[in-house]
Amino acid sequence: IHWEHQPVAIAPDALGTIFSGSCVVDKDNTAGFGAGAIVAFYTSASDRQVQSMAYSLDNGRTFKKYDRNPILTSTQRDFRDPKVFWHKESNKWIMVLAVGQEMQLYSSPNLKDWTYESSFGEGQGAHAGVWECPDLIELPVKGTELKKWVLICNINPGGPFGGSATQYFVGTFD
């Protein structure tokens, strides 16, 4: 593997510093940025956290921030780390966000307009710290034709043995 240092792809702006998130390839141009655009979702953090996006038309070398950022806001202090993926069964983009001590799910037909769908976490798992950096993936069940969804959730601080921790939940997703 050979790594080459590149300039900062998405710099802080008036909305704040840039926290973690995820990228998708919009192969069908649902957002209208261009077929095959790489669309980055990230948390803009200042006195509050909001969700923003930027897109690249040159394979991720440079990104242009969406001119209508932020795309999602909240009254919650901890509102971060968007994980976005295409859900073929619903024909929509799905966003999972860490919000306080739960995960919130949103859907969108075009990566720009998001609708709240549901939340998960109350009464589930560890709650000693803030939930963050979610991931939601579908995995096959060994030896069967079944598939299960796994929601991965990091806790910081508040791990059962001190420091940070990761927990996961196995179930269905619709």
Could you tell me what each predicted segment is?
Residues I1-P82, W86-C133, E138-D174:
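Beta-rich carbohydrate-recognition and catalytic domains
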